[in-house]
Amino acid sequence: MKVVVRPAEPRDERRWRELFDGYCRFYERPPDDALSAHTWRRILDPAVPVHAIVAEADGAVIGIANYLLHEHTLGLTPACYLGDLFVDPKERAAGVGEALIDWLVAQMKRDGWCRLYWHTRHNNYRARGLYDKFTKHNDFVRYTVYRK
């Protein structure tokens, strides 16, 4: 299977939403139409640093990655946070996730981002097997305070 990775386009919205909903369900969050619509609008807005790429095979979108570029206090150039990566379950173990990350690594080198980073659950062993091909995890612990 030949996988092509490219920036998301308006025509990808329906399939992006299906895959983003799958991502939300995987992390035990119910899909939220308002959140999906808001995120999609931000992805398409060139003034907002939220972006998405899609992996396509045989004309069908089979994977997505959403990322955010931001300034960083420990770098002279922007950092890239890979917020969401999801591959259609029927298409897994075929190099799709790797192709999405490869695309981001190439962009990092081309655009001079100071780093590309992401996180996953400690017990997401399948994803960690992929991520370990790119880098080893570090010893940082994440803390999150949510607005109530």
What are these regions (language model features)?
Residues 7-77, 107, 146-147:
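Acetyl-CoA-dependent GNAT
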Residues 98, 122-141, 145:
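Conserved active-site alpha-helix within GNAT-family acetyltransferase domains
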Residues 87, 93-106, 133:
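Conserved acetyl-CoA-binding loop-helix of GNAT-fold acetyltransferases
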Residues 59, 95, 124:
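Conserved G/P- and acidic residue-centered "switch" motifs that form tight phosphate/ATP-binding loops
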Residues 70, 88, 121:
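Residue-level recognition of the GNAT/N-acetyltransferase active site
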Residues 70-82, 92, 139:
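A conserved beta-turn-beta hairpin within the catalytic core of GNAT-like acetyltransferases
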Residues 109-119:
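Conserved GNAT acetyl-CoA-binding A-motif
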